[in-house]
């Protein structure tokens, strides 16, 4: 029997601080819960939305109940007895991190059980010897930044100086990352990508997970804005991924939508589709759900929840984006084929009500839909790898090294 899997990952959509959140400075974080609370109390109203958070299709898959199991609190405004059509769980992260790559790798069978390299100093973040090597190997004449920063704020602060000097803007965060912002037209997109490739080669031995190209446009601080031509240069996964097993054992198609291919360093990806906005990501995903052949795994990362709303601590914007996504989820559900398995999950938290601008260490929702799957609570997962192991079971692949299968279909003992 031919099968397809559709994975929709809402980047940063955590459902409550995990038991080790205090170790990460994230005690009290709850991305979903705090958004729902603000909405319920009319503190997230805008021209685009108002009132309680309305996510009927996510609720029908078990989102609210998953959050209830994780935190012992039902998100405000959610139904305690929704019309449940999905099976649901919640998962903690085995990897000792709260970044995009660790979360994604773990769910496909490669938890990060080593320490990433980090740039922990808030100012003068990058060691002089690294900066000297970058200057020497890339021939750039100088750089700006060299600090922890919000990507949108640093281009406001340094964008005009960048246009005067054409020095790239270097910055980082609490994640294992080196980010480079430059003007897409004046500095040049190809020049930015080439610079990032060189920097990635320099930093790879230090286990820096990603170098990210952050192009922007505009003429002054009032109208600088990042473009959709971001590019991630990531370390290759250290273990065989579910994707590779699917290709080797079943000759499957692995379809990346959004930044999935970059996150996995393009390992095990057979088709790639980029998209600029949340609407475009939904459109491309729906098109693949309608048209991808059998024996396919469709995987979309919905980055805007994280980049546009979580990091920017925009509660109303996050709520509005969730409500829009929920309307598009309805279309996905209506267009699933007879033997499709749908999975919704996240990779970490990024609570827009929380201090700072960084990710938050949280449980994630794990929501399944298949016509033969009994709607039920599937338990607490001790690793995001349970997602990949469940997919491997569904597709008839050999087991992954990590995780356990969560799926139990109607008629099974």
From Swiss-Prot:
GO CC annotation terms, alphabetical: cytosol
Residue spans crossing the bilayer: none
NCBIfam families reported for this sequence: deoB, PRK05362.1
Pathway(s) annotated for this protein in UniProt: Carbohydrate degradation; 2-deoxy-D-ribose 1-phosphate degradation; D-glyceraldehyde 3-phosphate and acetaldehyde from 2-deoxy-alpha-D-ribose 1-phosphate: step 1/2
SUPFAM superfamilies: Alkaline phosphatase-like, DeoB insert domain-like
GO biological process: 2-deoxyribose 1-phosphate catabolic process; 5-phosphoribose 1-diphosphate biosynthetic process; metabolic compound salvage; nucleotide metabolic process
Entries under InterPro entries matching the protein: Alkaline_phosphatase_core_sf, DeoB, Metalloenzyme, Phosphopentomutase_DeoB_cap_sf
Keyword Manganese appears in the UniProt entry: yes
Organism: Helicobacter pylori (strain G27)
One Pfam family in the UniProt entry: Metalloenzyme
Cofactor binding note from Swiss-Prot or TrEMBL: Binds 2 manganese ions.
Family: Belongs to the phosphopentomutase family.
Gene that this polypeptide is encoded by: deoB
Compartments where located: Cytoplasm
Main localisation: cytoplasm
Record's protein name: Phosphopentomutase
EC number, UniProt record: 5.4.2.7
Top-level class of the enzyme under EC nomenclature: isomerase
Catalytic activity, reaction form: 2-deoxy-alpha-D-ribose 1-phosphate = 2-deoxy-D-ribose 5-phosphate; alpha-D-ribose 1-phosphate = D-ribose 5-phosphate
Keywords for the protein's UniProt record, in alphabetical order: Cytoplasm, Isomerase, Manganese, Metal-binding
Residues binding Mn(2+) 2: 306, 311, 359
HAMAP family for this protein: Phosphopentomut
A molecular-function term among this protein's GO annotations: magnesium ion binding
Requisite cofactors: Mn(2+)
Function: Isomerase that catalyzes the conversion of deoxy-ribose 1-phosphate (dRib-1-P) and ribose 1-phosphate (Rib-1-P) to deoxy-ribose 5-phosphate (dRib-5-P) and ribose 5-phosphate (Rib-5-P), respectively.
Lineage: Bacteria, Pseudomonadati, Campylobacterota, Epsilonproteobacteria, Campylobacterales
Residue sites binding Mn(2+) 1 per the record: 11, 347-348
């Amino acid at each position: 029997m031919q099968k397809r899997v559709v994975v929709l990952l809402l980047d940063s959509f955590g459902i409550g601080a995990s038991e080790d959140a205090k170790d990460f400075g994230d005690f009290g974080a709850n991305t979903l819960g705090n958004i729902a609370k603000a909405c319920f109390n009319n503190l997230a109203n805008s021209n685009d939305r108002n009132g309680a958070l309305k996510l009927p299709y996510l609720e029908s898959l078990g989102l609210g109940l998953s959050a209830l199991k994780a935190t012992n609190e039902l998100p405000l405004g959610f139904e305690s007895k929704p019309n449940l059509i999905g099976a649901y769980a919640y998962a903690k992260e085995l990897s000792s991190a709260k970044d995009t790559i660790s979360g994604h790798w773990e769910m496909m069978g490669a938890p990060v059980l080593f320490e990433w390299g980090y740039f922990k100093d808030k100012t003068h973040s990058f060691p002089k010897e690294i900066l000297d090597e970058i200057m020497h190997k890339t021939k750039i004449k100088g750089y700006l930044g060299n600090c922890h920063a919000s990507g949108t704020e640093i281009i406001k602060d340094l964008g005009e100086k960048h246009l005067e000097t054409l020095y790239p803007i270097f910055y980082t965060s609490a994640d294992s990352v080196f980010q480079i912002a430059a003007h897409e037209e004046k500095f040049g997109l190809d020049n930015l990508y080439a610079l990032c490739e060189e920097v990635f080669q320099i930093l790879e031995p230090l286990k820096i997970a990603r170098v990210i190209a952050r192009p922007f446009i505009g003429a002054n601080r009032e109208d600088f804005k990042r473009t959709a031509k971001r590019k991630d240069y990531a370390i290759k996964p250290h273990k065989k991924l579910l994707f590779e097993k699917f290709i080797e054992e079943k000759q499957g198609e692995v379809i990346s939508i959004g930044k999935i291919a970059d996150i996995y360093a393009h390992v095990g990806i057979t088709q790639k589709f980029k998209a600029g906005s949340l609407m475009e990501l939904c459109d491309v995903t729906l098109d693949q759900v309608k048209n991808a052949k059998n024996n396919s795994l469709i995987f979309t990362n919905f980055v805007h929840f994280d980049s546009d709303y979580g990091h920017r601590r925009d509660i109303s914007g996050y709520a509005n984006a969730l409500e829009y996504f929920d309307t598009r989820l309805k279309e996905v559900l209506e267009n699933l084929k007879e033997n499709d398995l749908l999975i919704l999950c996240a990779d970490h938290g990024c609570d827009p009500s929380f201090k700072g601008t960084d990710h938050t260490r949280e449980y994630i929702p794990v929501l399944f839909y298949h016509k033969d799957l009994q709607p039920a609570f599937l338990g607490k997962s001790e690793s995001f790898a349970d997602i990949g192991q469940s997919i491997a079971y569904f597709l008839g692949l050999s087991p992954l090294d990590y995780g356990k299968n969560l799926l139990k279909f109607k008629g099974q003992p």
